[in-house]
Amino acid sequence: MLKVEERYTNAVPELQKAFKYENIMQVPKLVKVVINTGVGEAVSNSKALETAEADIVAIAGQHPVITRAKRSVANFKLRAGMPIGLKVTLRGQRMYDFLNKLFFITLPRVRDFQGVSNTAFDEHGNYTLGFKDHSVFPEIDFNKIEKPRGLEVCIVTTANTPEEGKKLLELLGMPFSKD
């Protein structure tokens, strides 16, 4: 099975032909992968943030940055500056390792998996994928998680349109649904 980096080198001529790029630098490429999770219960339980951080470190192989509330919301007992989530940005080799794991190990483990949505692209060709439960990742021991936690994976590309981004991710091995 080819890795994502190897698939990209094979995909460049195909993308160049499909979108009629004159210069090889016009071909879209991967920039970064951002993994984000909200830990709303961290407002009342500081241990929740620590366990979520340990899970993100296991999944991404890199320590996350704590995201903080921008403004106070009285109904949620939230004050500006309180920790409410975690995010980690993967670039370079860690990004490719994570995408290999995501495309070929994690997504096939999702129950009743029929492929990822074709419509989760923004207007610039970036793709966002949400997980309701982080236990589908192989590094997470299902017996040790306190609470299933959702997370979001955003794949950022240099594509200009959603069609370019979809073709790039398709050639890299992302399993899209057949609808």
From Swiss-Prot:
Pfam families in the cross-refs: Ribosomal_L5, Ribosomal_L5_C
GO cellular component term, pick one: ribonucleoprotein complex
Keyword tRNA-binding: yes
Top-rank taxon, per record: Bacteria
Gene Ontology molecular function, alphabetical: rRNA binding; structural constituent of ribosome; tRNA binding
Keyword Cell cycle: no
S-S pairs: none
Biological process per Gene Ontology, one example term: translation
Keywords in alphabetical order: Ribonucleoprotein, Ribosomal protein, RNA-binding, rRNA-binding, tRNA-binding
Role, per record: This is one of the proteins that bind and probably mediate the attachment of the 5S RNA into the large ribosomal subunit, where it forms part of the central protuberance. In the 70S ribosome it contacts protein S13 of the 30S subunit (bridge B1b), connecting the 2 subunits; this bridge is implicated in subunit movement. Contacts the P site tRNA; the 5S rRNA and some of its associated proteins might help stabilize positioning of ribosome-bound tRNAs.
Family listed: Belongs to the universal ribosomal protein uL5 family.
Quaternary structure and partners: Part of the 50S ribosomal subunit; part of the 5S rRNA/L5/L18/L25 subcomplex. Contacts the 5S rRNA and the P site tRNA. Forms a bridge to the 30S subunit in the 70S ribosome.
Protein name: Large ribosomal subunit protein uL5
Organism listed in the record: Dehalococcoides mccartyi (strain ATCC BAA-2266 / KCTC 15142 / 195)
